[in-house]
Amino acid sequence: MLGSAALLLSSPITHAQEYMFTYSKLYTQLKNNTKEGHDDVKVGVFFVDARTKQLCAIEKAWMEKEEHYEEFVIPASKELPLPIDKNLKSANPLVFVHTPKDSRCDYSLVVMTKEPLQGSVSYEQLKPLMPQMQSMLEDLGGMFAGWFTPEVQGVTMEFANELNGKIVFSNGQEKAIVNGKVQVALSEIGEGGTITLPEPTMRVLPYLPQAKK
């Protein structure tokens, strides 16, 4: 899900692309993280390379208003770690993000799990995520989203460094991880089944096979 951002000209001092948002604009979507019923999933903010569709590195990010300034510590997942705070919404500071100068990066708002998946992952472990992801997508979509939001049928798992590998199902089947991504429907695993991952995930997103490409 893409939003809009103000793109400022690349600065010869920072050698980066700079994006600017108002905090209140981001808070409108992120406040869904505080609602009950989303115990295992959240909304995350990322930047995605418009050409390669891979995550952009965030070189620096901060918010400021008048004499107040706070820089964010960017995690390995490349997520923008914004705090969710009503007082900040009222103060409405500006949020700045620097990404590499040689890439055009689009603002990306996603529904994802709060914790990575790793090792052996069971059908029963994944099943409770489906309604939570569905609910969060519909909350983001607004009042009538339930009419048009595709059904979440599994998970899209993303791995670091554009990993090429495979996941192994407990029934002996395998599925390729290509450029760090693999999509798995819950029905492919089956009740009582498991999948084995080669390394921990970086992001786990909904799998929406009925969504328009």
Residue ranges and their predicted role:
Residues 82-101, 184-200:
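Noncatalytic modules at the cell exterior or secretory-pathway interfaces
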Residues 14-90:
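N-terminal Sec/ER secretory leader and immediately downstream segment
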Residues 91-149:
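Surface-exposed beta-loop interaction hotspot
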Residues 10-11:
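N-terminal signal peptide c-region/cleavage motif recognized by signal peptidases
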Residues 35-39, 87-91, 149-151, 159, ...:
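Solvent-exposed loop and beta-edge segments used for protein-protein assembly and interaction
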Residues 71-77, 108-110, 170, 177:
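Short amphipathic beta-strand/extended segments with alternating polar/hydrophobic composition
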